[in-house]
Amino acid sequence: MGRIASIPVQRNIGRVKDGSLFPTEMFIGTSKVDESANVVASIFEKGYIVPRKYVGRSGYFWADDPMACDPTDDYAHITNRRVIDKAYRIAYDTMLEELLDEIDLNEDGTMQHAVVKSWQQTLENAINRQMTANGELSATDGEGCQVYIDEKQNVVSTSKIVVTLKVRPHGYSRYVDVNLGFQVANA
């Protein structure tokens, strides 16, 4: 899967714009892919990555990037898995800096508002700088993520802070239907 290693995390390995794959012939077992449409379709329906051809294009392309799991799963495609994995690595590295550091608290043992906002902004900035700015997240006004920390968490009693990070993935046009007809005025 050399293509996966050479493209950004949000990119689908089957993107037609990236061009065809290098092999000039591909096989499923001993049969050419071109002659095994039913077998290829059956394998694809089970959630496996398979090659395909397009009318009007030369060469082979990956049909999509499924993960061989329930198609409704959030991580049913390699694109989403790679995006969330990268966000996880950035969040881990960013929040690790805060581990065992002193935290200014309110009288009830909760984090002070300014500390919460600082942590939220630090993580959002890291994700936006390393992912959103590179086009790896779908964004509005440069923001491709949202971080939330509940200020009511009692750090003194639990020594634990739960941080919620949500990233906005891209969508993919897996199907395009064109409604074609004549444009004529009724006489």
What feature does the model see in each segment?
Residues N12, D34, N38, N80, ...:
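Detector for Asparagine
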Residues M1-I103, S138:
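A glycine- and small-residue-enriched flexible loop/hinge signal that marks low-structured segments
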Residues D150-A187:
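C-terminal edge-of-domain segments
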Residues N80-I149:
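Acidic, low-complexity glycine/serine/threonine-rich segments
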Residues V55, T140, V156-T158:
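A generic structural signal for short, non-catalytic loop/turn and secondary-structure boundary residues
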Residues Y75-H77, H113, H170:
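Histidine (H) residue identity feature
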Residues S31-K32, S42-E45, E143-Y148, S159-I161:
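Short amphipathic alpha-helical surface micro-motifs
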